[in-house]
Curated annotation (Swiss-Prot):
One of its GO terms (molecular function) is aminoacyl-tRNA deacylase activity. Its cofactor is Zn(2+). This is Isoleucine--tRNA ligase. Its main location: cytoplasm. The gene is ileS. It is found in: Cytoplasm. L-isoleucyl-5'-AMP binds at residue 567. Its EC number is 6.1.1.5. IleRS has two distinct active sites: one for aminoacylation and one for editing. The misactivated valine is translocated from the active site to the editing site, which sterically excludes the correctly activated isoleucine. The single editing site contains two valyl binding pockets, one specific for each substrate (Val-AMP or Val-tRNA(Ile)). A motif ('KMSKS' region) lies at residues 608-612. Belongs to the class-I aminoacyl-tRNA synthetase family. IleS type 1 subfamily. GO terms for biological process: isoleucyl-tRNA aminoacylation. A motif ('HIGH' region) lies at residues 58-68. Monomer.
Amino acid sequence: MTDYKATLNLPDTAFPMKAGLPQREPQILQRWDSIGLYQKLREIGKDRPKFVLHDGPPYANGKIHIGHALNKILKDMIVRSKTLAGFDAPYVPGWDCHGLPIEHKVEVTHGKHLSADRTRELCREYAAEQIEGQKTEFIRLGVLGDWDNPYKTMNFANEAGEIRALAEMVKQGFVFKGLKPVNWCFDCGSALAEAEVEYADKKSQTIDVAFPVADETKLAAAFGLASLAKPAAIVIWTTTPWTIPANQALNIHPEFKYALVDTGERLLVLAEELVESCLKRYNLEGSIIATAQGSALELINFRHPFYDRLSPIYLADYVELGAGTGVVHSAPAYGEDDFVTCKRYGMVNDDILTPVQSNGVYVESLPFFGGQFIWKANPAIVEKLSEVGALMHTETISHSYMHCWRHKTPLIYRATAQWFVGMDKQPTTGEPLRERALKAIEDTKFVPAWGQARLHSMIANRPDWCISRQRNWGVPIPFFLHKQTGELHPRTVELMEQVAKRVEQEGIEAWFKLDAAELLGVEADQYDKITDTLDVWFDSGTTHWHVLRGSHDIGHTTGPVADLYLEGSDQHRGWFHSSLLTGCAIDNHAPYRELLTHGFTVDENGRKMSKSLGNTIEPEKVNNTLGADILRLWVSATDYSGEMAVSEQILQRSADAYRRIRNTARFLLSNLSGFDPARDLLAPEDMLALDRWAVDRTLLLQRELEEHYSEYRFWNVYSKVHNFCVQELGGFYLDIIKDRQYTTGANSVARRSCQTALYHISEALVRWIAPILAFTADEIWQYLPGERNESVMLNGWYQGLSELPEGTELDRAYWDRVMAVKASVNKELENQRTAKVIGGNLQAEVTLYADEGLSADLGKLGDELRFVLITSAASVVPFAQAPAEAVATEVEGLKLKVVKSGHAKCGRCWHFRADVGSHPEHPEICSRCVDNLSGSGEVRHYA
């Protein structure tokens, strides 16, 4: 028996079936580094239009987690796809380096006894060490960027750039000093930004407190009475007993009705709507003797329960009837609304009582409670209120309360002298900042679109931005204040530039060691040099200034400096927010054209990632077991606009999908064996009809994918590429061409046409997957035939695809109908295999009973229909001749019948044909194979 295997064009490639990504990816990284891939991209892109994705800096602390990996991979997919689309898309990674978490780490490691200078030195060392660790992890994910020259907010140039950005805002009149309640953490000893506040349940003691009336006559008149027959008091309700010593006013709503209630021993003023619930709470009976509009009670004085001072009634719209008494006690130093209302009524800063120190302890001079920590003083305050007869009721409740994101301890609002960026302050020219920012939001594209309303609401309702902190490890606010007037030095902007130049050379340490006389000369004795540092959100919020137009200078020169900012949804109140404010203050527009927001990672049950739950996924572990390309494929396959589920099981599914894509690539490469595009590539008009369709289908898909990439719809890219590999290629085209590819002459038109199509598909596919499967695409690139440059990334989308010409007889619609027929035939072949009527598809002969239109369509393929259906014989008969046993199909006008072939099997092509054995020299094969071996070779036109 002759072995005909050697006469076949069997697939052959060195491209490995087993990916071995954990071992192979580091080798590919080394190759990218050795060829200077990132630098080469900058060289070839210098004359291209620019696309700037600006990296929101992760904090330089700890190992990266799955959220970091998700974020960086998304950014990399965009940068790579924009590069392939013909843009110069530089990517400069960055790190946020200053701030409390690093200072806290240093204190924990080295103790709190350190000098400020030593603290800064150790913080700088710690941040540098953390950056190196994170950098290695990010590079391992395949993220392409300027890793040798990242930006760091602690680099001297960037620290100086922040000071210059602040100087611009000072010059334009946005910065002011004010006493104002800010989020205050006792453990940090500093104000916190809104983004550093989180909410958690807290148990609080609520109290209802009676404030005796001081103006009896006015109160009686307000209620339409000649006089008060009994002592009277107004009752407040609060969850913060510790603020009672700082009470300076009482707030009621101007439009609510208030009742004067006779409870027997005294009269109580309560919101009319809440009288019943209040009396029940106080275990009292009473009756309403008069009512008055809230506005009628304005400026009536009541007495503080245990201090000799008055508390006037101020009207305020923020008073609610949801709980309490309808009366709010006002401690302007410890409540934002209280502060605003008291200021509106003319209270000046010097009048505001601030008995709570930065560590949460009352000043020693405070009567009754001096020297006590506020949370521990609550019982003593309640006891004092009870002692003076002012306590109406007390109970403990659990409610959502603000906590420090770092220490997880409760915060308070605390009025301190801080530096602010004014939201509604009139600048030297143009509109106030809030107005500018809201307009800029309208000019920004949001992905997903709901981000616009969210950021708009935050900007519309936010208070002035407190930019000062009382910490060591931060960029200084280099101000000199006049000792008598408290005013900024008249040459502040000029002095800030002098400081910036020093910081550029020596870092922030230059300010802290500076002797004021070096800059002020004889004036130095008249000025205080302040030691406040900038909020870290100012550090990252001004990177558009000190990075994109400073240390790295890659931004656009007109309009927004960056095309895209991309971060998690929490950054609407973080980096997106601070960048918008600084951009609008300095340039009068946002620093970005587009904002993309991604959701947070959760496990497969929708639970947050938590070490305590044991459901975290470590990127390093995934890299070392499955490979970074699997993580990248998971990112691409998941709609990032909501929560993104990830688990070992989900990643395993991604690994399965990866194998299907890799196997498709391997099939393509193995069937390009012996193909040299310079020698063997056929022109479209010389190719077989099915091959031309395959190239046309590839072109149509590429157009779709380019659009999905440009709109950042990576999950659509993934699903379409995966379906193309599994269905249109694996389930249709690649199966059909095997016979032609393996059995026809090695240099025949039939085979070279097929290889030409496979080559075009491969060139397109390797580029499609390059932004997602960065490592695998570059690996495939090395195995493709023909001369090529060193990396797939040094190219654009493939331009060698051709469209089916207008008026082509076997057009797209035609092949869609053929695919539908083939699907129906496959279904019946499967049934016959299951029933053991046939062993394999080639053992089948199929008769298609088709209506006139379908019959004409199928007839166009002639004898080549059997190759499309992958059966040994296929015939088309009029639909009316279908016997009773013919099987109905889902295709209209089609029935079919499958029978087992009665012929012998060809030992070479495995078709069952009547002419097997008809050639005496080759008794084991069919005449078609004989012709392909020793004759002129078979001629194919269609498939």
